[in-house]
């Protein structure tokens, strides 16, 4: 992946919560290879027309930490209406936590830019601040790394995610026609100044 493959799924859309995650936001932790079964299942649920492949995720999650950051958002099972049958790997059944979402960030070589590659939140957890918490964690990591700006692409047919990015200070730069393949959906390119 080159960093231009970013897309976001209903990242939060909680207009009553512009400043940060709500009490339902759960906890964030680094993504590990053992998470990929759940991540790929959620990817196919949210992006059935153009999901990342298992190979893409497997290649991304093992990238050096100086080039990528992937996070998992966990929440208490049942907080978002997730049934036991929705827990693919069984991890949540043991820990009482379920994967509510995930996100990824690429640090551009040279150290002044980052690119949000993906943010996805399980639909039953929409509006609980999980997308906001994931985005805020990515932005914080970019600031800590000295990045001056963060870029992303968001599907033109995803007003929830687009609205979150606008509320978080991203500005539209343009449109990439037919960017998402094979669906052909346009991408809105956005940028946030971190200075």
Per-range role (PLM):
Residues 135, 157-161, 178-183:
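Short glycine/proline-centered loop/turn elements that form peptide/ligand docking sites
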Residues 38, 163-164:
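Well-formed, non-transmembrane alpha-helical positions, independent of function
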Residues 2-7, 14, 26, 30-36, ...:
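Acetyl-CoA-dependent GNAT
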